[in-house]
Design a protein with these regions (language model features):
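Short, low-complexity Pro/Thr/Gly
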Residues: 1-419
Length: 419
């Protein structure tokens, strides 16, 4: 009956069909191999130390990379385990990628947390948590453009005259959390077959890459609305920001709520006893850290919406809007819009309260451009920020992700567009 119940409307769905669901098709790919190889690290790990890695030419291309660390055995491993949760993110203040001495991109400490909350699915977020949490060996994935997309793997074979370098600035608490004898960097190398290897080495390349811009942090006072000037360049896909003023001890490092420095906002690596007191999604991935509020079943809630401090730890942002050349880019919106509606429309992840984003792109996580705002052509970009609490000041950390073009020609590489 279903097959013969066919009318004019069905022609829009099945007329002149181009595909069948009952015969699998596939595409043949070029021959390749991969191998993970440890890099040589120059320098000695220490508080506020600086380490460098010149990427070895062990393969034709290099893709994903990881930092291996040894967290101290004295870190807390029980419920409310502040010091071991996401501990790998405590190691690096920032890491800079350069090619031939030119800075290509830079990743900042807070960007690791914002990236994992917004860009990762709940399953990957749990695995990220387990990778970066614990005593002993922990891993921190690098998240430059070539680490996240194999189609953007850096062609070392085409960079005969320029070296690829990573410079790591360590935090001033490195020795508190990590054994200074261990700081390893691993790179996943791609080996191409003969014909493709020849093409990569002889022709020029143009890669559409993604960069992260961060021009510093701004203090937002408690009285009234503050206008903050944005000094960004290039076609920007998205703005991402958070507020933090509680230092780096324990869960304060990741506490972006209105309850600054609150001991009631805790990091928890024990998922067995959170059900009655969880206002953010939890997973069954044992060992993945979670930020929660109200230890031991207390009354404190941790949600984005609400009035601080009456409702406990809430998202600190009251209202926000973007102003370009004196014109409102959109109508002023509440913090909940940027914490929940924007990520719902444009992101894979569900960020916890206090993390905000605004996307100019339909799909900011995609390499394919789906919308930008060219800040190089904007004379005056500002944001208007109003906080919920009248008795505290907060520090705003804002980041912009943008497109640029990496050109590789005649054995050398560099950016097509500078700042």
């Amino acid at each position: 009956m279903q097959l013969v119940a066919y009318g004019a409307q069905d022609t829009f769905l099945t007329g002149n069909p181009k595909v069948t669901f009952f015969q699998a098709v596939y595409k043949r790919h070029t021959n390749f191999a991969m191998e993970n190889i440890e890099q040589t690290v120059n320098g000695t790990p220490a508080n506020s130390g600086r380490l460098s890695v010149t990427v070895a030419r062990n393969g034709d291309l290099i893709a994903d990379m990881y930092v291996e660390l040894s967290a101290k055995s004295s870190l807390v491993a029980t419920t409310n385990g502040d010091s071991q949760c996401w501990v790998a993110e405590r190691a690096i203040k920032d890491v800079e990628l350069s090619i031939g001495g030119q800075r290509i991109d830079k990743t900042y400490q807070k960007w690791f947390r914002l990236y994992s909350e917004l860009y990762l699915s709940e399953a990957k977020k749990a695995n990220w948590g387990k990778m970066t949490t614990g005593k002993g060996t922990v891993y921190l994935p690098l998240i430059f453009f070539f680490n996240r997309n194999p189609g953007l793997a850096l062609p070392l074979i085409a960079l005969q005259y320029h070296e690829v370098r990573l410079d790591f600035d360590l935090t001033d608490e490195f020795a508190t959390y990590f054994n200074t004898s261990t700081f390893k960097v691993w790179g996943n190398y791609i080996y191409l077959d003969t014909e493709e290897r020849r093409r990569f080495s002889q022709k020029g390349h143009e890669y559409l890459i993604e960069q992260v811009q961060h021009t510093g942090s701004d203090t937002v006072t408690s009285n009234g609305t503050k206008q903050i000037r944005l000094s960004y360049n290039h076609p920007v896909k998205e703005l991402v920001w958070c507020f933090n003023n509680g230092g780096s001890t324990g869960s304060n490092m990741w506490n972006f709520s209105s309850n600054v420095g609150a001991t009631d906002v805790i990091l928890n690596c024990d998922v067995t006893d959170l059900g009655a007191n969880c206002y953010v999604p939890i997973t069954a991935g044992t060992g993945a850290p979670l930020l929660t509020a109200g230890p031991d079943g207390g009354s404190l809630r941790w949600v984005e919406d609400g009035v601080a401090p009456t409702d406990g730890a809430v998202g600190p942002l009251s209202t926000f809007k973007l102003v370009l050349n004196g014109q409102d880019r959109f109508k002023e919106q509440a913090g909940k819009y940027f914490n929940q509606v924007q990520p719902y429309n444009h992101h894979t992840g569900t960020p916890y309260p206090g993390i905000y984003s605004y996307s100019f792109a339909l799909e900011p996580e995609s390499h394919q451009p789906t919308g930008t705002c060219n800040f190089s052509r904007i004379d005056n970009a500002q944001v208007s920020v109003t906080m919920k609490r009248a008795d505290t000041s907060e520090t705003m950390h804002m980041f912009a992700t943008n497109y640029n073009v990496l050109r590789i020609q005649s054995g050398m590489g560099g950016l097509a567009f500078s700042n």
